[in-house]
Amino acid sequence: MKQVTIYTDGACSGNPGPGGWGALLLYKDTVRELSGGEEHTTNNRMELLGAISAISALKEPCEIELYTDSQYIANAINKGWLQGWKAKNWKRKDGELKNIDLWQELDKLLSLHTVTFHWVKGHAENKFNNRCDELAVIQRDKFSGK
């Protein structure tokens, strides 16, 4: 199974507002950059879309180390929240699950790969996370008309 490292980030101006996401896929000596955005979105949707888009770009099952500065995503996976939401028919104990469409899509993708999620501090010394942030901000600014 191929071993791939993924970095993702999201950015939003206002919440909701224009937003963007960026992702890097690292395989051997190759780095592939991906990015996108939406005119009216939230920071959490952009974080999720970054992860979903990066994993979706893989053409075969892989062993993935995914790095995100989103505690929302890292905690949902690493603390078992995602599995709990799924077991409760995609609901939280206090009601509606936000971004259910994206969580369901991510869950399907995770079943195709072996993925380990890592939280990294945003806007720090990690050059890969910082590049994802740059890509996300470029997209956010594009959708905000800057």
Model-identified regions with their sequence ranges:
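RNase H-like nuclease fold core
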Residues: 1-45, 49, 53-62, 133-146
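RNase H catalytic domain
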Residues: 11-18, 52-131, 135, 140-142
